[in-house]
Amino acid sequence: MNHNSGEHQTKDSNSKSLPDICNVNNENRPILPSASTSNFQSSKSHRLSPWSINIVDDPDYAEIIKEAERAIKNGVLPARIAIGSSGSYFVRNCEGKTIGVFKPKDEEPYARFNPKWSKWIQRNLFPCCFGRSCLVNNQGYLSEAGASIIDEKLRLNIVPKTHVVRLTAESFNYSVHQRLFLTTKRRTNEIVDRHMPGKRIFELEELRSKVGSFQLFVDNYIGADDFIKQIEEQPLPDKAMEQFQKQFEKLVVLDYIIRNTDRSNDNWLVKYVVKPSNKRDQDEGDVAASSSKTTSINATNPNTEILIAAIDNGLAFPYKHPDEWRAYPFHWAGLKQAKIPFSEEIKSQILPFISDMSFVQHELCDEIERLFALDKNYSRRLVERQLSVMRGQILNLANAMRDGKSPLELVHLPGVLVERVRDHSLAGRKKFKKKFNDRYPLFSWF
């Protein structure tokens, strides 16, 4: 059990303890050119709604969204996922194959149309035990998309691609009066059409579309809990274990940077693929048959590939370090893989990115702020607090990697905030200041 540690310890950005933090002349002027900077500036200036149609820069992703829309139009409706604290849906194509997971903003735990009765009771009768005080309410869909941005920028390739889109489907949770009004209009038109073919009284309106995160669905993965139990009973070959360790370290990097408050061993997935041992085996079977299922561990075949999928990233990007009842620890810190220092391969991949404060600010922080600015309840002050936590996490991660620490040692480092403040002695230029978090939660173990 922890307690308050005392006053903030504040250091200037030019001190030796913060070597990678540099002064910024103007918050809207990049240190280095960035293709995203102009877009970010325009999104803050005009605040135009981007949700009229689903357009993304990735043509393959956009085509999957179109598949989902065609399927819904043809009656293949998204299916609500029973587990979880919010309304989330398996989205299928016209053939009935699951292609994504959609999580509407207005069906999140604190939202008006959350369909889970257990959460409604908890929210209304036991509010003191509900939610996470360090997170911004009803922004889980942005957190999902933000994790995908961090994953892409750092080239981790462990988060299934996620964007914010709009979808409309009758299987989503709408208000009773809205459904009743639409049903009454339809039935009235049907009655009129039976007596006067081709005539109708009402122009039918679609149910309003819902904005939310759409994450691509991944096949042939199993839960990390099941996978870890399997490899404890039947250890992996050395090469496969090295692959798993590197993938695990990528998960650590992602979760630590975004300060994921909900990473347990049942919301990250593992795919274990046994590749064909020779060309003949590969030619004889189709693609599906040439890769074995992930549920079977083959300790005798060294020709394997292990992949991790980090799903359920909706409870991340806090605006402060947890400092009340719960600490929301990373559950992977209890695994033996967390006791191994970061590998040279991961350090050589990640350190050049996170040691460059220009990259951190313009390729990570600005992109996250541009995403969060799309929300109708956007608060620049609150987002800046979220980014202060993220920059502090990045600073801790960089120092831990340089010092040869392990993920377990990383999570025991004191919480840090790196704030962007205006220096009046330097004609209003922006600089970064580091300070340690001075409040800790009552319970550190859950």
Walk through the language-model features, giving the residues of each.
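Residue immediately N-terminal to the catalytic "proton-acceptor" Asp
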Residues: 261, 266
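Alpha-helical interaction elements in eukaryotic regulators
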Residues: 60-64, 143-147, 164, 214, ...
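C-terminal catalytic region of ATP-dependent kinase domains
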Residues: 3-20, 24-27, 31, 39-44, ...
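Cytosolic, low-complexity regulatory segments enriched in Ser/Pro/Gly with interspersed Lys/Arg
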Residues: 1-66, 70-75, 116, 123-126
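Conserved ATP-binding subdomain of kinase catalytic cores across diverse folds
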Residues: 1, 59-239, 244, 256-260, ...
